Structure formats: structure tokens, C-alpha cells
């Protein structure tokens, strides 16, 4: 069963077990410290000390007590998993500005500062450890053959459908930082509010 997700990296996160049963509330409820890895579409309640690692100083950074500037996905090599579960390589298009570092390097340096040094010191070594733990991630551009059981057919609920995305042009920090995307968003909003002309 393929589900179109509204957040980048969600499929890959599920593949490596980086999800919490019960969602964000279960993961953060009562937390004294929250390490936010660029999650700008979530609201973090007051109280916890927030460390934000991200690229565009968006919503997540505005709630942070400490900001660690990381590369945007276009500024570092990466491994992504698309909706159908296909691992894909992405190559850096440019270098991160200022003091921003590649995200894996920030986590590795922080682990050493905390006396819990992670067992890899390069992207190649990290990727090797990742593939050892999750072998399917080595099969670049291949769709895993998954067995599935048909879901039971039920009478649909009487709830109404709604769009999960309110503004397609401003769905993430990179898009929200773009002047072009802001213009497209404004044009789409004006088009939606304009009266329809009779033909």
C-alpha cells in the first residue's frame, strides 16, 4: 500500500525505524530537551530546551534555544527514499553558505563532544553502516517487492475530504525562502479568489 506523504524524508525515516508510535506528541511529551532535525512544519510546545539543526532559519529555528546551521538537501550528497520505497542518490548542487556544515558531520561532531563518539567519520563510512543495518538502501533505483494483504472493505465514513496541503508553493523551508515560490503562491491565491467569468 503506497501512501503519499506530506513531509520529505518520512518514508526513509520509517525504513530506518526513526518514527515514534503515537506521533510527535508521544515523542515530545515531558521532554526536557528536543533535538529538532529541521522539522519546520511542527509546533513544539513551550517548556523544553530546543536544539534546532536546519538550513533556512524557518519555523523550527524560531522556537530554538540553540541553532546548528546545517546544509540544505541541495548542498550535500544524500540518500533519499521516494514514496514507492525506491532508494535514490542525490548529488550536491552547491556548497552551504557561511558556517553551515553537512548534517552528518554536525551529528558526528556533537557525538564526540558528548563523549559518545559515533563509529563513523566520513559520509562513506556512515553510508556503509546504514546499508549494513538496512540492506535494502544499497539497492539504488530499485523498488523493493513487498508482500501485502488486501485491506478489508468497509463502508466509508461520512467525513469530508480536505486537502492536506493548503499552499503547494510554500510546503517547506526552501520553498518559503524563495521569492519565486512566494510570487507563485500569491498568484494562485489571487486566481482562486477571482470571480469566474462566464464563457
Residue ranges of model-derived segments:
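Non-catalytic alpha/beta scaffold blocks inside enzyme catalytic domains
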Residues: 1-140, 192-199
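Long, low-complexity segments enriched in small/aliphatic residues
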Residues: 127-199
